[in-house]
Amino acid sequence: MAAFFVPVVAMIIIFAQRGIFPFGEECFLRTDMYHQYAPFFSEFQYKLTHGGSLLYSWDIGMGVNFSALYAYYLASPVNWLLILCPKKFIIEFMTILIVLKTGLSGLSLSWYLKKHFGVNNFGVGFFGIFYALSGYMAAYSWNIMWLDCIMLFPIILLGLEQLVKEKRGTLYCITLGLSILSNYYISIMICIFMVIYVIAQMILNPPKSFGAFMGTGLRFAFYSLLAGGLAAVVLLPEIYALQVTASGDFDFPKTFSSYFSIFDMIARHIGNVGTEIGLDHWPNIYCGAAVLMFFLLYLGSRKITFREKAVYCTMLILFFASFSVNVLNFIWHGFHYPNSLPCRQSFIYIALMLFMCYHAYIHLEDTSWKSVCLAFWGAVSFVLLAEKLVNNPEQYHFSVFYVALLFIAVYGGLIYLYHKGKWSLDAILLTALAVIAIEAAVNTAVTSIPTTSRTAYVKDNQDVEELVWNIKSDTFYRVEKTDRKTKNDGAWMNFPSVSLFSSTANASLSDFFRKMGCESSTNAYSIAGSTPLVDSLLSVRYGIYGDQQPADGLRDLSARKGSMWLYENKFTLPVAFMLPSDVEGNWIMDSGNPAHVQNDLCDVLDTEHVLLPNESVTEGRKLTFTAEETGDYYVYVTNKKVKEVTAVIGEQTESFDNVDRGYFMELGRINKDVEVRLEAGDDGSPTLQAEVWRFNPQALEAVYGKMNRNPMVLSRWTDTELSGSITADTAGVMYTSIPYDKGWTILVDGKAAASRKMFDTFLAVDISEGTHRISFSYEPEGLGTGAWITGVSAAVLGVTVLAGISRRKKKDRAVSGYSIRKNHKENKKSQKKESGSKQENRTKENEK
C-alpha cells in the first residue's frame, strides 16, 4: 500500500505548502485545466444536477455536440460523482481526483509487478511510487482526462499477458475498453503498444505450433476489437465530431528528421530537471535516480534470460526513436503532431523501465558485489558525463547533477548494507522507502504543481450567475461576457455563450469568426473583436460588463449585481430568420479584411457601411489617430508580424496580445478629438501597419430592419429541441445561427426537410412561401450505431465469459472425476496388495 499512500501524502504535503485550498487561497488549475477542464466539469455538473441533456449544449461555443465533448474530456466514469459535488467545490473535486488517481497509478503498477513475478515483497511499492511520481506525472498530472489510462495501463499489460499465456482475454478486454472509453486519445498509444507487446510476449513465450501462434493472434484481435466495441457508444460520436475540426486534416510527413540524441534523452532520467510541456519535444521520463543503477544491474544479471533482455531493450530503443524521429512521433500521436505536451506516450516507456529495474531488484541477493560496484560507477559516470555534455541550463540547474549523485550514493550504500548484512532487512527497507519518498516528492515539488489564485478565478461568479439566472427572455438568446477569464466562461458559469476553446472546435466556425474580425485559432474562437453587427448575427442579446457602459443607443441597462452590469442589445437578430435572397450568393467573405467583409454585407443589403474609416499616422512601431467623431472604435492590424499592441487612450492604457490572429482590437467608446496612441510590443521593431474604424449605429439599425422582416417565432427551446413558426414572403432560405451539424433534424410542417450548410458554417433550410411550423431536434451522428455496437459487444463478451466459465467447470469436473477414479484404482491396488500380504503372512505362520 506504500505505492498508494506515499504519492497521496506527498501530493497533499506539496498542496499544503503551495497554499492550495483549503490550505490557502490558491488552486491547481494549470494550463488546459484552467481554460478547459474546469469549465467543462462545471457544465457537466450543471447538466447532471439540473436534468440537462448530455447530447448538446448551448453554453459552449454557439452550441456544441456535448456527447463528443464529453467523450474527449469527461468520459471517466468517476466524473459522474459530480452529481454529489456542490458547484462551488468543483475545483476541489478535480484536485482530489488527481491526488487519488496518482496514488492508484502507483498501486496499479505495484499490483502488476506482484502478479507478473509472483512475488509479494515490500520492495514492489518502491517502483509503484516512482511510477506515480514520475516525470510524466510531474508534467501532466493536471491533465486529469489522461489519468485513468495511466492508472489502467499496468492492468492492461497483465491482461494481455494472461491472454497470451493462459488464453484468457477478459481482463485485457474490459480494462482496454474502459481505457478507450475514458480517453480515446491516450488509448490510441496504448493500442499501438499492445500490438508491439503481444509480439514481444509471443517471442518470450513462443507458441508450440503454428496453430497456437494463429490462435493467439486471432484471440488478440478479437478481444481488442471487442474492447473498442464496448466503448463505441462514446467513441463513434466523437470520431464524427473530430472530422469537422482543424485536426481532421491528415498530412503525413514527407521527410525524416531527428530532434535530439539518445544520450540527451537518457539524461532526462535525472531528477529535478524541468518538465517540458511546450513545443520542444523533450520526453518527461524521470522515474528515480535508482533506475540508472538498476538498469545496468538488469543488463548484467545472469538470472534474467538474454531473450528477455533483447526484447525489452529493443522496445526501449523503439521508444527513444519515437521520441526523437518526426515520423514515429507523428504516428504515436494518432497521426498528428501534438500541439505542445510532447511525448504523451512516455508513461509506457517509464512502466517498461521500472519493470526491468524491478526484475533486477528481485535478484539483488544473487547479484555479485562486483556487479553492484560496476552498476554504481556506471550510473555515476553517466551523471558526470551528462553534466559535461548536456547544454540546457533552463531545465538543468547545476544542482540537479549533484542531487542525482547523492541519491545514487545513498542507494548504493543501502545495497552495500544489504549485501554485507550490516543492518537488518527491515531497517534497510524502511530507510529505502523514506529515501524514495523524499526523492520522488522533491522532484514533484520542484518540477510540478504551479498554482493560480482561486479567489480571482471565482471572484465574479456569484454575481454573474445571479444576473444570468434572472434573465426572463421569451426567446432564444446568447450572452457575451466582456471581462473573460477563459473562452469557456459560458460553460463555467452556465449561460448560453459564443466563445470556445476545445480540441473539438468546429473548423468552419473558426474560419467564420476570423473572417468577421473575431479572435480564432486552430482549436478556439472567441467573441473578442466582435462588433455590434456580429453580435446581432450571432443572436447575442445580452452583454455582461465589469463597469457601467456609456449610452450609445445600441443597448439598455437590464440589471446590476455587485460589480457586474447586464445590458440588453436592442438590435439582436433571432436564432432563425428568412435571409434576403441576394445575400448568400453576393456577400463576399474572403476579402481578407474583416471591415470590408462586414461592409460588403451592408452593400448587399443596400445600407450604409457599419464601419467607417478614421485617418491615422504610422511611424515605425507606433500609430496615432484622433477620433473624428464620438463612437466605438476598432483597430485592425494588417502586419501579421505584430503580436502585441499597447494602446493609450487619454489616461487609460490597454494591452492586446495575439493580434496576429487577425481580430479587431476593441478600443471602446472614444469621445471626439481624443488622441489615441498605439505601439507594437514585439521584438524586431515590426511596423505597426493598421486600420482604424468607427462603428456606425445607424447602419446597424438599417441592417437589422432588413434582416428581421421574417423572423422565426420560437415556442419551445431546450438543449436538443427548437420549435416555432415562420412566415416567408417569398420562397427562400431560412438562416440560423446554429453551427451546422449533421445531427440536426429539421421538420417543416411535420415533414423532414433537407438541411444545408450556409456560409460554410451555419445550419439552414430552404423554405417555400407562406407560414410554416418549424421544429429542430438533435441526436449526435453515430450515437445510435455506437449504442448498438456497444450493446452487441457487451453481449458477446458476456457470452464469451460464461462459455469460459462453463469450460473451466467441465474441465474441473473432468479433472475431479479422473482424480476420483485414479484414487479408487489406487485404493483397490492397495487393498489387493494388503490382502496378498496378509495371506502371505498366514501361509508363513502355517509353515512354521
Task: Enumerate the predicted regions with their spans.
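Active-site lumenal/periplasmic loops and adjacent helix-entry segments of GT-C-fold
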Residues: 14-117, 121-154, 178-182, 273-281
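Contiguous transmembrane helix-bundle modules in multi-pass membrane proteins
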Residues: 167, 186, 310-330, 336-462, ...
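Extracytoplasmic/lumenal acceptor-recognition loop(s) of multi-pass membrane glycoenzymes
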Residues: 435-455, 467-538, 571-573, 578-600, ...
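Periplasmic/ER-lumenal interhelical loops and adjacent helix-loop junctions
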Residues: 31, 35-44, 77, 216-219, ...
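Hydrophobic alpha-helical membrane-insertion signals
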Residues: 1-64, 452-462, 466, 471-491
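Membrane-embedded helix bundles of polyisoprenyl
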Residues: 98-116, 121-205, 216-244, 379-384
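Active-site-proximal, structured, solvent-exposed surfaces of multi-pass membrane proteins
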Residues: 40, 603-828, 838, 847-848
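A cross-kingdom signal targeting lumenal/periplasmic-facing segments of multi-pass membrane
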Residues: 78-83, 107, 502-626, 640-641, ...
